[in-house]
Every structure is written in C-alpha cells, then in structure tokens.
Amino acid sequence: MIPPEPGLDGDADAPAPGPPAPATAEGYQPDALPIARRLATSPLFFPLWFRGRLGPETRMPMVGWFDPAQLLSTGIKSLVSLAVGEQSDRRIVQALASRRQEYYDHAIHYRDGSRGPQPAKDAVRDELWLDFICDTGDGWNSTYAVAYAAAQRSLLVPLDGGPVALPRGDVLVFGGDEVYPTPSREEYQRRLVAPYTAAFGDDAPAERPHVYAVPGNHDWYDGLSAFTRLFCSDIGGRRFAGWWTRQRRSYFVLKLPHRWWLVGSDGQLQSDLDVPQMEHFREIAERYMQAGDRVILCLSMPVWVYAQKYRNMGRVFDETDLIYLREEVFAKRGVEVKVYLTGDLHHYRRHQETAESAAGEAPVQKITAGGGGAFLHPTHEEDVSVLQEEAVTDDARARAFEVKATYPDMKRSARLAFGNLRFLFKNPRFGVVPATIYLITAWLVGAAAGGEAPSNPWRALRVTVDAFSTHPGLALWCAGIVLGFLAFTDTHSRVYRVVGGLLHSVAHFSAMFYIGWGALDVATRWLHASGVLRAALAGVGTFIGGWIAGSVVMGIYLLVSVNVFGRHSEEAFSGLKVEDFKHFLRLHVDREGHLTIWPIKIERVPRRWRDRGEGDATTSRVVPDGTMPVELIEPPIHVA
C-alpha cells in the first residue's frame, strides 16, 4: 500500500472518501478564487456582479457630453492632445514610413483575393458610386441608421418622376470624427465597427467595396493611434466590416473614372496641412494628373465657415492652406477643385459659387454634411448666407459663395433649441456639478454666520453679505465661481464675456441664496430640527435643490445664448442629444463623366430594432422594427 504524500502543513493529505471530483483544467482551482468572485456568479448576490460591463456588441447610447465624468475625461484628453499634438505629429512618422507617393486607382475594377483586392481582368470602370459619411460613431440608433442605409445594395429615393434606385457605394469615405467622445480600440469597436459590421451583415458581393477615412479632431485625441491601427495598418487584416481598407497614411488620393480624383486631407487639430502632406499631393499632381482633371477635396472641418465666422475675431481659422493647395498644387497644372466635402458641423449646408464669381463656368460646391450619427448642430446660430474668400496669392481670384440649402432649416433649428428647457431631464447627471457648488457655498456661508437661522429672506441676505465681508476665504471661493462662468462664456468679445458671464453668475447665486435659505428655514421652522440634524437636513435640501435649479438655469442660459446671441451652439445642442436629421452623400460619376451628388436624409431614425427575419429582403443582421423612410434633402446636385 502506497502511503499518502505529505501536505504543505507536514500532515498527510489523504483523499476524502466519496465520489471523485469533477475534472477541471489543469492548475485551475475555482475554490481558491476570492469570495466575492465566487459569490458574484450566484443570483442571490447580484449586487456583487458587475452588470455594466460593455461588450463589442453593446448598443451604445448617445454620448452624455454633460456627464461630469465625461466632461472631465474629454477635457483632459483634449488639453493633452493640444499641448503635445504639434510636437508628436504622427503624419510626419507616416510620411517617413511610407515614402511611396501613391494613389489608389478606382478607375478600375477589383476582385477579392487571398491577399486583398487585386485588379480584375476586365478592369476599366465606366462609372462609380461613392458614399461620403461624416461624424459617425456615436449612439447606436443614429449611427446604425446611417450605416444600415449605406450598406444596402440599393436605396430607393423618391423623385418627382418616381423613385430612383441608387446603388451602394463602390467606395466609402469617412470624412472625419469616426468615433466619439475620444478614440480607443474599444470605442471604435463599439461605436463604429460593430454597427457597420451588423449593417453589412453576411453580404458577399463579387467585388467588395473599399473604405478610406479622413481623421477629425476627435480621432486625434490619442495621437491617431487607434485610427491608424483600424484604417492604416495590416494588423488584424485589411478589413473594416464588409469593406476593404487600403490606405497607409491619414491622407490619401483616389483616382476615379473619367479624370476625376478624390483627395482626402488630414488637418490634425487646427486645420493645418503639414509640409509632407502638401508635398505628397504636389508630387501626385505632377506625376499623374493632367490639365482638365477635376478634384473632389475632402477636409475634416469646414474652414470656409469658420473663416467667415471668426474673420473679425482674431482670424482663428483661415483658408490659407486650402487656397494654397487649390492654386499652387492643382491650378498651376490645369487641375480644378470642383467640390469641397466636409463634416465637423453636424448638419447639412451647401454653399455654391455665385454666378458672378464662377464667370460662366460650372460653379464650385462647398458642402458640409456631418450627419453620420453624432448629435445635431444648429443651422441658425450664424449668418453664413454669403461667404467671401480672401486671395492669398497674387494670381488667385477671391471667390464668393452663397447658401443653397440647409438641413434642418433655420426655423426648425431654432425651435429645437427650446429643448434646453428640459435640460434637467436630458442631462440628469450634470446636476451633481451645480448641486455640489450650491452645497459648498451654503456650507461656507452657514459656517461664517455662526449657524444662525434667519427667519426671513431680508435677514438672510444681511447675514450673507456680512459673511462675505468678514471671511476672505468665502469671498475668494465665490470669486472663483464667477471667473469660471466668465471663462465658460462662448465669445471673442470681452464685453459679452463680462456681461454674459456676470448674468449667468447672478442667476446661479440667486438660486443658491433662496435654495440655501429655504432649506435651512424648512429644517428649522417646519421640521423643528437643531444642531447637526438641522445642518444635515438643510444640506440635503440644498443639494437636491441645487441639482434641479442649477440644471434649469444652465438650460435657460444655453437657450438664450444660442437663440438670442448665436453663441454656445456646441453646448446648447450637444446636451439635446438629437438623434434625428441624419444624412450622408452618395456621389455618382456616370458613363459620360458627369458628377452628381445625392444628399440623402433620414428624418427620424428608428428607436426600435430587431434581428433580421426570413422575410426581410436585406443582408443586414439588424433591421428597423418598422419603417425607416429615406429621402433627399434637396434635388440631386449636378456638378459637371
């Protein structure tokens, strides 16, 4: 008989009688896990189970831009990216790593091979369809609605003469800000890759479409690392959902049929086209483009709008790089930029060159189409009905442009702004910020007043004024709050900053005073509390009141700012989280070489989705639970 082996405690560990233990993986001892980990799998101990874990298939909500944690995280990342972005420009590294000045030829057909797309035998294209989608990768409903529409083999859109079928784009171009709020591999997967994978589904076309992407400022917040891995790297295979990826840099040039070209530029964080990028475009123009060729130029932001908006406010944005690229790189070779496409502003707005400026030629189009999934931006906050370029070279003519279409229209945009009256309900977590400020202020005032409980508001006001005059720390705290409101005010005018910031401060301080005194009065006279209990009850009341009143004041401030002064458009509409009014562009180079742009809109995106059923005529894995009408924003735009 073989004796048992001695245990670690020196005693013999004889096997216990009974049935043998179930087989487990070698080295795995579940009984040795921490108690909380073992209990977490039991439904009786569900509080220990982390139910909020996000998987790659999670249907993400719209980004809560006014959530305190989100505000802090995004603010820090944007400041860091601005501080180090200029010194760690990944575009320079890309230029050094890929010295070939190459373009991607889509004037030919491709076939799918084991090593990616290869030119087909009967290669020459006589026409091409191209989709342009900007500002996507936000909430599931809005992002997937656009992805679903773009991924269908054909879209039927109504026209006066009857519905027209628009085939899916042979090429998909993302025009910037592919993910929100900040880039990471996880966010790209959840907010961009997963929706487009589900939308493309199990479709297996004979010739898969290709995808290219221009990075926006949100893609740059990590130095472009996640973007580069997804769109510019061989890691993980050259696939994005059902599309092939091919680009090696964050900027690219596509050759299209009939002497059309598409140029995708990378303006980093400040709409700055770096020298290697300019030289890349210049060399391709010199070697491959010919006089009479036409260019579609894609940018990450509408610099023509920002230049007009800030022209008299310090020239924060200008069109110098844009005009230099047009005049010095292309025009000197007889190549003309006919269309400018961009996003960044999450609405649709088309500017067309005026007849006087075009001088008998086909007018140039400048189109902002940022409706790929992100929250809606207003169209009524700024007068950009007429844009005037500034000539930056002696032989360049200054061109004028006028608005031809906006979506949503300006009146509807102004009406949507009234949603800020429900700011409290649309951004419930934001209330912790004013609630904390109100509570700390009331606490400091109460401590300075020696715990006195004034019986009327006039006495309370006098006690408060005395507290400020005799306690410098309290005065400095409140001065810091005022400075914060002044800094928050969205303006380049010192007068408006002071007036707007002070009025905003007065509104909050008034709410603080009445809520703080009211909570103390209720605790004293109604609840007959005293001492620590009174202070605790008054603190709870002040916190709750600050949560509600602070959010209401913020909503009113944003509404007045955007509808009266045309300021805070970003804040006023990001808090609304409008999922609707989504859109994208479908471009068509036809057999005769004419370019037509179809601006496609989804007025209301579905809120309910279901898995594809047997009777659904689509390859998408998820379909709307109901109808999703697709229409045109305006009649198709015939460029040339």
Residue ranges of each PLM-predicted region?
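Acidic, histidine-bearing metal-coordination/catalytic regions of metal-dependent phosphoesterases
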Residues: 1-174, 179-215, 219-258, 292, ...
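Active-site-proximal beta-strand elements of phosphoester/diester hydrolases
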Residues: 127-138, 259-269, 296-300, 364-372, ...
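Active-site neighborhood of phospho(di)ester-bond hydrolases with catalytic His/Asp-centered motifs
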Residues: 133-134, 170-177, 207-217, 265, ...
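Active-site environment of divalent metal-dependent phosphoester hydrolases
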Residues: 139-141, 180-183, 215-224, 270-273, ...
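Active-site-proximal segments of metal-dependent phosphoesterases and phosphodiesterases across multiple
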Residues: 141, 269-279, 290-339, 361-362, ...
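Conserved beta-sheet core of the metallophosphoesterase superfamily
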Residues: 213, 313-387, 550-582
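Preference for well-ordered, secondary-structure-rich cores of eukaryotic proteins
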Residues: 232-239, 249-252, 265, 276, ...
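A short, polar/proline- and glycine-enriched secondary-structure boundary/capping micro-motif
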Residues: 273-276, 377-379, 606-612
